[in-house]
Amino acid sequence: MPNPNPAAPYELANLEHLENQVRQFGELLGQTIREQEGEALYQAVEKLRRGYIQLRQQDAPALRQELMQFILDMDVNLLEKVIRSFNTFYILSNIVEEDFRDRERRRKFAHGDPLLWRGSARRTVVELKEEGVTAAQMQTLMDQLRYIPVFTAHPTEARRRTLMGIQRRIFVAINQLETESLGDEEQAALLRQIKGHVQMLWRTNEVRTRKPTVEDEVNYGLYYFRESLFEAIPLLYRYFERAMRYAYGANQVTVPSFLRIGSWIGGDRDGNPFVTAAVTRNAIRLGMVEALYEYIKRVDALRNILSHSTEFVTPSAEFNAYLHAINEKMGNRLLAKRTDQLLEEPYRRLLTIMRHRLKGTLETIKARLSHGHAVLPADAYTSATTFLHELKLINQSLRSHNDGIVAGRELKDLIRLVETCGFGLYQLDIRQESTIHSETVAEILSLAGLCSNYSQLPEAERLELLGELLMRNRLPIPHRPDLTARSAETLEVFDTMAEMRIEAGSDIFGTYVISMTHHASHVMEVLLLAKMAGLLGYNDDRSLFCHIRVSPLFETIEDLRHISSVLTHLLENTAYRALLKTSGNLQEVMLGYSDSCKDGGILASNWNLYNAQKEVISLTDKYGVTCRLFHGRGGTVGRGGGPTHEAIVAQPPNTVHGQIKFTEQGEVLAAKYSNLETAVYELGVGSTGLLKASAGLVLPRQPYSEAYHEAMQEIAITGEDSYRELTDRTPGLMDYFYEATPVQEIGQLNLGSRPSHRKQVARDKYSIRAIPWIFGWAQARHTVPAWYGIGTALANFQQQHADGAERLKDMYQHWPAFKSLLSNTQMALFKAEMDIAHEYAALADNQEKAQAIYQKIKGEFDLTVQEILHISGQEKLMDDTPLLQYSVRRRDPYLDPLNYIQITLIRRHREHVNHQAEASPWLEPLLRTINAIAAGLRNTG
């Protein structure tokens, strides 16, 4: 089959090789099962695998009944092992696919199109040059670029770190297996090594035996720095530099260090009582330890490389002056026993001093992790600033005596890392829900005698009071013992921020995110609490300082619609504008994809987010404020997921001003950053998406046709009404959700530290969090939140307008936002399976209501598929992404038995819980099916 998209990084002609390799690893797993567990398990797995493949090819009721009876006849032990077999196969096939993608990119790099693939740095830069972007304009673009992925702990991330280590070793071995120069004996040895890894995969429990702590989640995030990011970050910059040279020539465009990594792990306390101030301190210190270990390792490597002797080179005068000063201050004392040895090797001498200083900082941070307090030695670094200055001095000096090639390798990579990560490794965001701040402020103001009825004040009076208090020289400091425990803990978070800014550096924190922001006063309340901790106030010369940035998070459909009103009240407040100006005049605004989709469905969420971005940028431009949009995207389509490059390019024209920030959920982290090769690719396509979307800074983009917007407005209204008709106005829908999906059991899977519900209440759409809402529907193969309402909306638009079909087709062809929406929807539809969903519906108690709800969902599913195929001009879903289509289709025959097994186990487990006092023997295998189906679908929530 020819590749329909020459700019794609993968050649479909090579799919046969991929299929053969997947088969090879399936056989390796089969051998392992036979050897470790015996013939009976192997035959059981094969019977199910082959049987469901036959059913996919041609439905046969007798065979389907035979397979269902076979599942029903299995005992608990055999069921568990069958589930583990399929799960292990998914893990292996995912690794093989990732290796295939990496090899195809490398092959294209070596032998293919010189512009590489869509989203590569080279292709992107060349395309922008062809559009008319000059070298000077490209420099302007690059200087404003700031790409900030933010790692989060995902409540439904189903993968253990132990397994990820084994998977990484398998990935590396497969890569080696593809080396053309391998001899027969070497290949056989590698296959034995891989088989050993597969055996360890089989012997390792994929289900956590306990719920992870927040510290476990912090370490989970740090894993990716060790495994890939420390190497990927410098490579990202190198690829951009090569692209600039290719397009514009040498030394025409300088690539700044535009990447920053953010994190919520250890800072996100919204709905998670386990994230305390102490946990936040430790999250920062653990990141610092990781960074400092890496820097020490790299400084050691540089000491071995930069062996220049003063017999042959003369360092720069600036370097010599600095080395002399540092020798006088500490070097002669530290190197008393090595003075002669390093006297003629100036770079080694300085690097040895630098290592000692890094070690002093590291040991202090480790001591603080152990017992909370330790004094930093006088010789140790207090921040990364001096360390970076010394590295740049060495770089400049090396280049002064024509050692630019040496300077441009390991030393430059370390400089890039320090510029990107500092000593803190990542910038930690703090997040808390707005009502927590409101209650704390009300309590403090009442105790201080400043306002006894704050919670009853109208919004305008709140803003006036808060503004006046913020501009005061001093505020009454609340007596902590008089406060409730929650208010005292809320204040302690701000104390911790003030403390850790001193310990870890002024840029250790990103922003303070306020979830469920409904009013401008919610932002002002956070600033008032920050003032009490000394994070803002007046300098001795009466000038203002503000060491905190606040990001309001707009999550629900209603909040998105009121975003202009909230921001207008905020930006017109004199006190707020003064504080914003002194903190850099940058306003970050976060947009929530998960709750808005759960609330109003994918169409309303998508369109209201699109409009909100335009409104926010228009407002901030009006008030002369720089704006950075922070996208709270998840891994699934229902939570804003989808290819990062396409998602960024699809933003409204002229709304991305060089900066973008977005969450990388735990489920996505493993897929993107477990392996170096994939991590470089993912960082690259995200960064080039940002570069493309920001091109309007130098080449103003025309907005898309108003007719597109009018059509989308109409479609979104219809889609939201259809979705709400199902989720809000259909009797029994929430009972159906809780009974016809495994959402009740998901909470027992020990997936994350955060509770799955906001509070323990009756079955209600607004009490369950967005992530388990989407996870539950996905497990039961409904995927409702990601597509429901689209079919009705598209069909209705065509009924209302004679030229409706032509208009929608035009939008699909020429409007990236609309095409991205429908392309992502196709993935969700492709992963749904209505026949299997019907079997889940049979789990519900009230079958009359359940069957009516199922038929409603099935009808909308069929309509949505029909309408999307009609508008896109495709014969089948995902024809426009054939490799992805192939990947998902290949998994179906393996997912089918797992879903039927899960249905059986849900029924047995719930019957046991309802009638027996002892622990259910069916729970453990049921939890394994959740893990296995998540691996097969390649996403959770």
Model-derived regions, located:
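Often metal-dependent polyanion-binding catalytic scaffolds in large enzymes
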Residues: 1-467, 486, 641, 727-730, ...
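Carbohydrate-active enzymes and regulators
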Residues: 32, 61, 96-98, 119, ...
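Long, compositionally biased intrinsically disordered regions
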Residues: 693, 700-941
